[in-house]
From Swiss-Prot:
A menaquinone binds at Y15, Q227, Q228, G229, K230. The gene is frdB. One of its GO terms (cellular component) is plasma membrane. Residues 13-98 form the 2Fe-2S ferredoxin-type domain. It comes from Proteus vulgaris. Residues 141-170 form the 4Fe-4S ferredoxin-type domain. This is Fumarate reductase iron-sulfur subunit. Binds 1 [2Fe-2S] cluster. Binds 1 [3Fe-4S] cluster. It is found in: Cell inner membrane. The lineage of its organism: Bacteria, Pseudomonadati, Pseudomonadota, Gammaproteobacteria, Enterobacterales. It is an enzyme of class 1 (oxidoreductase). [4Fe-4S] cluster binds at C150, C153, C156, C216. The keyword Calcium does not apply. Its EC number is 1.3.5.1. [2Fe-2S] cluster binds at C59, C64, C67, C79. It comes from the Bacteria.
Length: 245
């Protein structure tokens, strides 16, 4: 990096489970210009100051969802966050509400298991390729299109106070994906997903703070998906009560 670049102090959370009792912060002096992302800055630290710094990243384009972390206590993607917005310094921490494995790397096992549990794929559609494309109208696609933009970054879980209180809550992304498929005209698997949504750790754990939608980097609006999920859950309950046994 050029000598005439600006410099900023970055407080970065460090934690090595083999040597540290608890996470701590180390301050690094990092050069930056108008185009330097937080991910670039972390790369500078790793290449020049702390080779043992651990963090996740991949695409650099807000597609893979790998580089989520807390930036001044706000969940953000490092690749979409720019150092020019933090001229007075910045504090970087591992993604909130997740167990820390090392430095900025968190254990996302429960997150992945929650996504798997709601079966995020089309179910019950026996249409054969020989029958041609499974067409949808624009109106049918509009029902789920926004919810299909989720990149599984986990920022909504870091923002969710209920997930912080109850780590068994399946969470915003899982419920959003369930709603994405439940509202897809090609899918017939809502009945298989409803037990997850109706359960103790399903949609009714949400108290509708709405912060999950504020931090979503793809504007998926998981808060709206959860409220739709509550309506579907209530309808499912009423139908079950009235249905003859």
């Amino acid at each position: 990096m050029a000598d005439d670049m600006k410099h900023v102090k970055m407080e970065v959370m460090r934690y090595n489970p083999e040597t540290d009792d608890a996470p701590h912060f180390v301050t690094y002096d990092v050069p930056y210009d108008e185009q330097t992302s937080l991910l670039d800055a972390l790369g500078y630290i790793k290449d020049n100051l702390a080779p043992d710094l651990s963090y996740r990243w991949s695409c650099r384009m807000a597609i893979c969802g790998s580089c989520g972390m807390m930036v001044n206590r706000v969940p953000k993607l490092a690749c979409k966050t720019f150092m020019r917005d933090y001229p007075n310094g910045v504090r970087i921490e591992a993604l909130g509400n997740f167990p820390v494995e090392r430095d900025l790397v968190v254990d996302m096992t429960h997150f992945i298991e929650s996504l798997e549990a709601i079966k995020p794929y089309i179910l019950g559609n026996d249409r054969k390729p020989s029958e041609g494309p499974n067409k949808q109208t624009p109106a049918q696609m509009a029902k789920y299109h926004q919810f299909s933009g989720c990149i599984n970054c986990g920022l909504c879980y870091a923002a969710c106070p209920q997930f912080g209180l109850n780590p068994e809550f399946i969470g915003p992304a899982a419920i959003t994906l369930a709603q994405r498929y439940n509202t897809d005209s090609r899918d017939h698997g809502a009945k298989e997903r409803m037990p997850q949504l109706n359960g103790e750790n399903g949609v009714w754990s949400c108290t509708f703070v709405g912060y999950c939608s504020e931090v979503c980097p793809k504007h998926v609006d998981p808060a709206a998906a959860i409220q739709q999920g509550k309506a579907a859950s209530a309808q499912d309950f009423v139908i079950a009560m009235l249905k003859p046994r």
